[in-house]
Amino acid sequence: MPSHTWNEVGLWGRSVRANTAAKNADLLAAQGKGFSYGPTHNLHMLLFAASYDGQGAVATQAGKDYRKYAGDAQFEATTLIRFGRFDEVLALNHRPDNGASAAIYDFAKGYAMLKSGDLAGAETTLKTLQGYIATTKDKIRFHPAKTVVGVLTHILAGEISVTQGDTEAALEAFTQAVSLEDALDYDEPEPLPFAARHWLGQTLLDAGQPSKAEAVFRDELKDHPHNGWSLHGLQQSLAARGMDDPAVNEDLQTSWARADIWLSGAKF
């Protein structure tokens, strides 16, 4: 699939087009026209690329289609979190039976609770996730579920700390999330449609540490080139110090040309 190459070099729009074509071929094959190869993989690739391209409608629909096809709502939930559609997460009622998928789904529910003002619900979810990663031997493909879900657990813990005004604890949690994310082996698409550095960088920026935020966003762009979430964070980190980089501005404008959302930060 050409989209594996497009993802690696940050040509997210091309990846979306390639995987849309693959998805459509799968639909035709279901009608006896042509053949199908890896329909769930195609949908996962589509939602992943669209998430980094800012195409929320495409990403979230691919997540829903994945759930309908595979009976697993984890990607439906995480793409909705990526695009800040918390009311839709709270309305979900398709908790997976698989332990690892259920934990990812629970993270999304807990995060949406927090963003909707239910701190107690988010804290209860956090305890559940902490219990899961302490004991699980599950796998998500070839990744230890405790590592993938560990990333999410620390993101939720950090966001709870942000809500409580404890920036130091939040930064510590997000740093731990980044460390776990960095420990994951190469996989494409990755298990999550977002990066822990989006939370770390944005929190550093909000805490008045734009130089550190800049470094985080530049590191993130090495992992996912030309993604608007990190480019916006980088642009704002520079602006906070009275700096402007035309190359960054142009990259953001080009990379975010197909996006259907307005960015207020690197994460919702």
Task: Please place each PLM-identified region on the residue numbering.
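"A position-specific structural signal for the A-helix of alpha-solenoid helical repeats
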Residues: 1, 45, 75, 104, ...
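Start-of-helix signal in alpha-solenoid helical-repeat scaffolds, especially tetratricopeptide repeats
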Residues: 36-40, 70, 103, 144-151, ...
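TPR/TPR-like (Sel1-like) alpha-helical repeat modules
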Residues: 7, 12-25, 51, 57, ...
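Solenoid-like repeat scaffolds
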Residues: 23-33, 63-70, 92-101, 130-145, ...
